[in-house]
C-alpha cells in the first residue's frame, strides 16, 4: 500500500541545554505523564553514552490487540491526525467508534495462511495502522517520530495457531503500542548537544504547542535529580522452578530428535515487587550500560530494560536492512569479591569461542537471519558483515554477528518486520514450528519479552531492539523473562542456569533499589 496524501504539519526545533542524566530529565518532564518514552544508547566497548531520545508527550496513541487497531487522540493536536487518517483507514478495514473525533478502532481481516509470502506482505494488515500515519507525513522535512513496543505475541496474528490454547497469566500487554510524538528531545552525548522538537498537526494548535515547548524548556532549568524510593521485598518467584524448566528442556529435546526443530528457545519468568521503576532503570543503566536501553511509561504498564541485541534496523538512505543475532553466552569472570578477574574473564571467553555447542547454535541463528534478510532483500545483496565477535556486559558475555541486505524497493521497514518477526534468537528454527512449540510448552503469552522496542520515522528510518534483559511492570510487580538456546546436545541444568544468568542484571538492579529504602 502506498499513501501519498499530504497533511498539514509544522515542526520547530530549538537547542536546549545539554544534560547527561537522561533519567533525571525524564523524571522532571515525564514521570507523571503516561504515553512517554525514553531511549538511551551506549557504546558496547567503552560503555560511554551515545544518543538519547525522549518522547516527552504524544498527540496520538496507537494500540493493537488481535486484529483490532485503536487510534486515540490525546489532545486537540491528535484529533486533527485522527481526522486525516480516518478516511484512509476505512478503505483497509471495518472502522467503529463512539466518537470518531477522539478515538476509533479498525478491524483488519486475518491473513489467509495459504497466501504466498509476497501476497501476505502486500495485503492490508495491522501494520497499516502505523504505515498510514507515517505515510501521511512523509513529505515533512523533519520526519515525525513513532515510538513504542511490538509485543512477541503480535506474531500470533500471522502464524497458524490451530490447537494451541494459552492460560491467562493475569498480565495484560497489547500486541503493539506506539505513540506519535508531539514533543521530542534528541540528545547527542558525544557532542554534548540537545534539541527540543515540536510537531504540530493542527494549524489552530500552533500557539498551544509553542507554549508547551516553552514550559518544557523552563522545567529543564530545575531538573529533579531525586528519585523517590519505597522499600519493597526482594523475594523473587518464578513460573517454572528448575525441575519444571529442565523438564521442558528435556521434552523439547524429543522434538529436536524427531526433526520438528533443530534449535529452540524456551524461557521462564522471574517476578518480584517493583514500586520504583524509574530508579530501577537508572540502577540497571548504571550497572549494565547497553546499546539499547529503554523506559516506556504506558497507561497500562511500564517497560524498562538494557538490551544488547538489535531486532531490526533499517536505513532508507542506502536501503540497508540489518539483523544482529546474539547466541552463545558465558557468565563474566568474577573473583571472590565480586570484581572482574581479567584472566578468568579471558578464559571464559576462550571457552565460549571453542564450545562446539555454542558455535553450532550461533551459526544456526546466523543462517536463520540470512534467510530472514533474503525474504525481503534484493538478490545478491545479503551478506554476513561480522561473524562471531564477543560483546561483554555486566554479568554475561555473548557471541554476536551482523547480517545485512538491501531492502527491495516495493517494501518498507514495517514489511520487513512483518516478514522477520520474531527474531530467531528468541524463537529457534525452523521459526514457525519453534514458535508453535514454545506456546505449547510455556502455555502462556510472552507479552513484551522477545518482542521489540524502538521507533519508526516518516522518512523511513526504523530502529528496534529485542526486548530482553528487561522488566515488564504491571500492578507493582516486575516480570523478568529469560530464555536459553537449546540444541540436540544441550544439558538441561546448564540451560536453566543460563536463564538465571540472563535475568541476573535486571533482578539485581530492582533488588538493589528495593532494599535502599530499608
UniProtKB/Swiss-Prot annotation:
One of the GO BP terms on file: L-tryptophan biosynthetic process
InterPro entries recorded: ADC_synthase, Anth_synth_I-like, Anth_synth_I_N, Anth_synth_I_TrpE, Chorismate_C
A GO term for molecular function: anthranilate synthase activity
Regulation: Feedback inhibited by tryptophan.
Pathway this chain belongs to: Amino-acid biosynthesis; L-tryptophan biosynthesis; L-tryptophan from chorismate: step 1/5
Keywords: Amino-acid biosynthesis, Aromatic amino acid biosynthesis, Lyase, Magnesium, Metal-binding, Tryptophan biosynthesis
UniProt-listed Enzyme Commission number(s): 4.1.3.27
Cofactor stoichiometry and binding remark: Binds 1 Mg(2+) ion per subunit.
The keyword Ribosomal protein appears for this protein: no
Binding site for L-tryptophan: 41, 291-293
Gene3D superfamilies documented for this protein: Anthranilate synthase
Pfam families named among the record's database cross-references: Anth_synt_I_N (PF04715), Chorismate_bind (PF00425)
Cofactor(s), by name: Mg(2+)
Function: Part of a heterotetrameric complex that catalyzes the two-step biosynthesis of anthranilate, an intermediate in the biosynthesis of L-tryptophan. In the first step, the glutamine-binding beta subunit (TrpG) of anthranilate synthase (AS) provides the glutamine amidotransferase activity which generates ammonia as a substrate that, along with chorismate, is used in the second step, catalyzed by the large alpha subunit of AS (TrpE) to produce anthranilate. In the absence of TrpG, TrpE can synthesize anthranilate directly from chorismate and high concentrations of ammonia.
PANTHER family for this protein: AMINOBENZOATE/ANTHRANILATE SYNTHASE (PTHR11236), ANTHRANILATE SYNTHASE COMPONENT 1 (PTHR11236:SF49)
Family of this protein: Belongs to the anthranilate synthase component I family.
Protein's name in the database: Anthranilate synthase component 1
Lineage of the species this protein comes from: Bacteria, Pseudomonadati, Pseudomonadota, Gammaproteobacteria, Pasteurellales
Gene label: trpE
